[in-house]
């Protein structure tokens, strides 16, 4: 799910960036350092939407660098247990399949795939229904439900299921 939150960060800036464009240099360094990163507590930072305050700089002894406390607004993505997501399948094997929803990788075990789907090995491994009408393979889009998350310092991993109503393949590029 997406959230709009306020975060704080201490930014160190080299003396060569001081001058008329100090604020612009500080904001561009903040965007470069923060956007696209993951903190286990807040999730993935998608975009910085605004700068609330830039505090007074503190000169670091011996280096000349200055540390500025910056308070900024940003959009973060953090998946939760029970959330329904649409994802793209990236890998299929006999244990299940992996899918990606934005920066989050989700594993769906073969035990969390409907019982009527069987694994088919070959050059394009997939899970296929007995009548062949539905096929889960690489690059197809699936709707799944998050049933568990594991949060590390720099990544979020999820376990999902498609063994529920209205879940499963929503778009198969191979069928088109």
Curated annotation (Swiss-Prot):
Question: InterPro entries from the xrefs?
Answer: NA-bd_OB-fold (IPR012340), RNA_pol_Rpb7-like_N_sf (IPR036898), Rpb7-like (IPR045113), Rpb7-like_N (IPR005576), S1_domain (IPR003029)
Which UniProt key words apply to this protein?
DNA-directed RNA polymerase, Nucleus, Transcription
* Any one GO CC term of the record: RNA polymerase II, core complex
Gene Ontology MF annotations: nucleic acid binding
Q: Which GO terms describe its biological process?
A: DNA-templated transcription initiation
Q: Where is the protein situated, by its record's location annotation?
A: Nucleus
Taxonomically, the superkingdom here is: Eukaryota
Extract the Gene3D superfamilies matched here.
Nucleic acid-binding proteins, RNA polymerase Rpb7-like, N-terminal domain
Q: What is its main location?
A: nucleus
Q: How does it assemble?
A: Component of the RNA polymerase II complex consisting of at least 12 subunits. Interacts with NRPB4.
| Protein task | DNA-dependent RNA polymerase catalyzes the transcription of DNA into RNA using the four ribonucleoside triphosphates as substrates. Component of RNA polymerase II which synthesizes mRNA precursors and many functional non-coding RNAs. Pol II is the central component of the basal RNA polymerase II transcription machinery. It is composed of mobile elements that move relative to each other. NRPB7 is part of a subcomplex with NRPB4 that binds to a pocket formed by NRPB1, NRPB2 and NRPB6 at the base of the clamp element.
Protein family per UniProt = Belongs to the eukaryotic RPB7/RPC8 RNA polymerase subunit family.
Output this protein's name: DNA-directed RNA polymerase II subunit 7
């Amino acid at each position: 799910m997406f959230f709009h939150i306020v975060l704080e960060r201490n930014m160190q800036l080299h003396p060569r960036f001081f001058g008329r464009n100090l604020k612009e240099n500080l904001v561009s360094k903040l965007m470069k350092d923060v956007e696209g990163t993951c903190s286990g507590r807040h999730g993935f930072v998608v975009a910085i939407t605004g700068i609330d305050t830039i505090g007074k700089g503190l000169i670091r002894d011996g280096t000349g660098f200055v540390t500025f406390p910056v308070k900024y607004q940003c959009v973060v993505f953090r998946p939760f247990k029970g959330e329904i997501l649409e994802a793209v399948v990236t890998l299929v094997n006999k244990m299940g399949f992996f899918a990606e929803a934005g920066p989050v990788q989700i594993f769906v075990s073969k035990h969390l795939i409907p019982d009527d789907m069987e694994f088919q090995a070959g050059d394009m491994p997939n899970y296929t229904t007995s009548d062949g009408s539905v096929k889960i393979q690489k690059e197809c889009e699936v709707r799944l439900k998050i049933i568990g998350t594991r949060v590390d310092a720099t990544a979020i991993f999820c376990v999902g299921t498609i063994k529920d109503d209205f879940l499963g393949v929503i778009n198969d590029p191979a069928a088109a």
